[in-house]
């Protein structure tokens, strides 16, 4: 277990409340699935009999076994396999006719195992199952008002599995039931179908007179025993019977209908019933109580439901999602077993022939491979990993679709406080549909989000007791104050009136009336947002961008701790699993780059101490899903004593166990020759030469040799018509040597493929059969380094034999490592949503410099601050400057204004003044312009007219690197139908010239440019070949011909039976038809 740093959320805390483990939600959900969920599903499927009832298959789910995985996590990643364990369940097959019994452990399939970091390894890649937030099963009441002001009410009973039941009143005061999507029937028919008498119905209702209209409408067909019209009688009887059948099959049978534990709990709570939790189907009592509540609403008694309130939305975590998939797989298996029992003779059947693991394996593989909720893990940095595991999505099966989701669903709701972060969500179509768990939030047994609060009595916040976790529906009944209240040294509330939340309203209340207080100022926000210092001074839109962009920061070669942090950096590094934690106290006996050995004393079962050596393996230059480098470095030395929970090794984006995503650099907010116009950034060449923003990226390439119709492909060094220079890095087998430096176009793996010789004569075939293959009969299909890529080969892996899919003889994986320095076109950002693209790299002697001669590292546009309202960056850079000169690092809890107005400004100014006193530099804090200083132009040595804001800002280099985006094409592939160049960098495509661009050229009258773009640069096949020849031979470019797309248009019109042709106009009025396909 990891030891979590104790954290004091409010000053003068008597009881220190720890931040919960940030990935506990994933781990506990999977644990519950293995302990309970899997057994539940196997129980529902435990007995299967054939149609004659003479053969019975029984499973014993409580005794199921999981076999130890064949390969561990590291080996699974290396072999590109899935980290799974085999599921065996004891089964008994009884032949009741002969009395024969077969018993054995049956193999049902493989279940992927969760790693200790909350992810799964599927085909060698880390994947995460995202938590889904959906409408909770239960009953919901809604009111609708038409244009004339008439009210109608409806009740919808939502199940966990099965049809929905809707009961509604109409504008005439009639009550109807709607089952699923079929036509609606009168509620009286439903009551009669359930066998209720009038007296039973009336006794259950508070206002039975409201039913009179419905009875008058329905009773002529139900009540009159003496009917004169046989047709009516038949119709009413058939309606009654069909309604009874539908109710019986859809709502009263557990095989087809399941309210779930949550649905039963919600219905019991809403309708004040005491039906046992194990009855998960609808009962007569439920429907009567639902109708009673609906009628009460007509008399303004009762409450309507807000579907966006978190009490009506629950979280489906990884365990539940896999359990649902296991149910699907077991359902398929059940049908297969039933079919086999019917088809085969009972005497010939065995357990192994009857139970096939394929249905369950297929269902689980389908979920992990293609479900919307199973996602490729974001491994850009430790923060992106942890945030991905804490994500909440409204999308996916059983959820919303982004097209249908309105504003109400996406909006922030008062019940989100302390549960879902109001800041962190994507920009674009998914805004509000994908959220992130708040720092202290947890999921209760029913799947509802809870948040912790301290109990408050008579203004005193009781911190000596553990906080109480409140669910959203419980919190509505109390007056709850936020976590950033100012408390006295005795933990009592200082102010007489405080802001509170009460019954969904944000209001003010007397301090004596407060029931609960939040445990921390950061309780309402997510982990990523709580890493932003001075968050309270940023506009929410920019804080959102800051939260999202921290997840895109690339781990750097020389990471640096932020001077100004928030205190959450250590927590994120610990819980992400990127640092190596000591499991037992002991002494370090050996340290190298790959392994750390720790000798510890342990107590065995008999109470005797014995020496034990713990071995810790470090990850070295492994590739992440986003091609960033995963590397661990030891931070302990031989002979050092370590305690349980100490950090033994740092990850690629941590320093001494603290998250480090960027660098502290000296910035100046000033314009510079227009190079920082519109968010462009000007940087010093120091950042390039000193590798301050250099990062390592590892790309993986693979090639396989297959069996073909003409013979097997071969991995070899003998490649026809290839320059020896391209083969310089290959070994004798034609595979690149690890450590080799490779450039674009170099061969990584030499491969030849047999090719068909179309002109081969029979005698030639005979000669080939006698003398064997010749070199000319194969074509070069080697794996080459793609355009724009160069680097060092760090890993080469050959796969042969059983590891490969059918038809593949050999597979080779090659990993190339690149060192990428910062360059023009790369994207950078701060933690406050202040992002930009590097526009120019200046020599350090040309950069503006401070009064002590220090050149600044980066020049930012000051106009980027006022309109964006992210003033937090200014506070951060000024405090960072003070910290640099005072050699101090700061951990600042967001929302410090609880200590008084202008607290942040006071802290920054006091630290700048302290730095001035310590260093003797009066310009560090000038009373006339605090935070600003005179700067000098590096080119001329003259001072700038106005004082400039300077400071140390923590800037990140983002994963949007120009090397991955820049693209140019001269010639390349064309589309088969239109003969126009393909689009996109991956296909080596061209630039799209859309209709708006055509309009622009037309507007300027650039006729020849336009003609050239639409013909020889696009789809005039003959014209572009002629133009290429003319360029090579230095001749004038000939006139363009007809674009291929025009020919396609004519062919399409002709295929619609329209006689369309192209004619050459003559003066003699004898027009000649031209075959475009032949002549032009």
UniProtKB/Swiss-Prot annotation:
GO cellular component: chloroplast; DNA-directed RNA polymerase complex; mitochondrion
EC number: 2.7.7.6
Alphabetized UniProt keyword annotations: Chloroplast, DNA-directed RNA polymerase, Nucleotidyltransferase, Plastid, Transcription, Transferase
Gene Ontology terms for molecular function: DNA binding; DNA-directed RNA polymerase activity; ribonucleoside binding
Main localization of the protein described in the UniProt heading: plastid
InterPro entries xrefs: DNA-dir_RNA_pol_bsu_ext_1_sf (IPR042107), DNA-dir_RNA_pol_bsu_external_1 (IPR019462), DNA-dir_RNA_pol_su2 (IPR015712), DNA-dir_RNAP_su2_dom (IPR007120), DNA-dir_RNAP_su2_hyb_sf (IPR037033), RNA_pol_bsu_bac (IPR010243), RNA_pol_bsu_CS (IPR007121), RNA_pol_bsu_protrusion (IPR007644)
Keyword Plastid: yes
Cellular compartments annotated: Plastid, Chloroplast
Lineage top rank: taxon: Eukaryota
Reaction catalysis annotation: RNA(n) + a ribonucleoside 5'-triphosphate = RNA(n+1) + diphosphate
Record-stated family: Belongs to the RNA polymerase beta chain family.
Record-linked NCBIfam families: PRK00405.1, rpoB
Complex formation: In plastids the minimal PEP RNA polymerase catalytic core is composed of four subunits: alpha, beta, beta', and beta''. When a (nuclear-encoded) sigma factor is associated with the core the holoenzyme is formed, which can initiate transcription.
Protein name from the UniProt record: DNA-directed RNA polymerase subunit beta
Organism: Mesostigma viride
Taxonomic lineage from the root: Eukaryota, Viridiplantae, Streptophyta, Mesostigmatophyceae, Mesostigmatales
